[in-house]
A protein has these predicted regions:
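Eukaryotic intrinsically disordered, low-complexity regulatory linkers and tails enriched in Ser/Thr/Pro
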Residues: 1-75
């Protein structure tokens, strides 16, 4: 898996995903065309950068995460 450093954080390449969905108890957050993802062990939060350059912060507490890969199974 390809990685890169941004602002002192290591981001993983998740550009093979068409979308990524984080489900919470009362809502869900869907990110189209995610490109890079960082997980913070201390906070439990995720930072996701999408194809349009929008940064998303997903706090701890989500119940379920799912995504669809562009080229079939990718883990």
């Amino acid at each position: 898996m390809k990685t890169k450093e941004i602002a002192g954080m290591t981001f993983k390449d998740i550009s093979s995903e068409e979308y990524r969905v984080y489900q919470f108890a009362d809502m869900e957050v869907r990110i189209e065309k995610p490109q890079w993802m960082n997980f913070n062990i201390k906070s439990g939060g995720y930072r996701v950068l999408d194809v349009d350059g929008i940064s998303h912060y997903i706090p701890t507490g989500w119940r379920h995460l799912y995504w669809k890969s562009e080229n079939g199974f990718v883990f």
